[in-house]
Amino acid sequence: MNKIHLQKEAQHGTPQFRFQAFSQRDTCGQYFAPYHWHDEAEFLYVTEGSITLRTENSTKLLTAGQIYFINPGTAHALFGNSEVSHHYALVFGLELLSFAQYDVCQNRYLEPLFSGKLLFPPGDTFEPETSVQIGQLIAQAEQLYHNTDPAVPASLSIKIILLQILEILFSRQAFLPSGDNARWKSSEEYSLRPVFEYIEQHYQERITLEQLS
């Protein structure tokens, strides 16, 4: 039996550009992304059907037209909920958006995100026009990511798009304060993490619910 990796150890993208985009289509209602977490943000946009997103604290049914923001370090899983579904996912390290020269933008908007003082909002309750606006940007970023035309400045365009999404969120005052101890910066493990780690260490053994409790 192969060792089951419950935590994604590898960073997405490349060291030169920590960004990766996915277009996930399910035609049999069996889409499944098992519980995992990473130190990168993840943006979701459902374009067809519906999927179920489960995190440590909530279960969300995301339907066509909805977006969702997953903060770095949040354990999550995705499940197909309709016979046919499609969604985009963007995964990237927040430092991708950092400026070489420290300025008011870095200080006022980006640094609170990098430090964990501000968290992305869930996004599933946004007004339809906001969801469409952000969703279209997510789709554009995914298409650019897979564009192999060397004449297209894809990485630059993707970075601009991500900043545009942040601009929309800041203009709507949508970011959430995290308190003094940022959730994803904390040295404490989430309640699910010890469970995942125990399974990973004992995957060849018979595991009971009592052992996981």
Spans of features found by a protein language model:
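Conserved short histidine dyad/triad with adjacent acidic residue
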Residues: 21-38
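Short, conserved beta-strand element in jelly-roll/cupin
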Residues: 36-53, 69
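Structural motif
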Residues: 50-52, 59, 75
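Short acidic-glycine-tyrosine-enriched beta hairpin
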Residues: 57-72
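Short, Lys/Arg-enriched, Trp-marked, Pro/Gly-tolerant hinge/linker segments that flank
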Residues: 120-132, 145-211
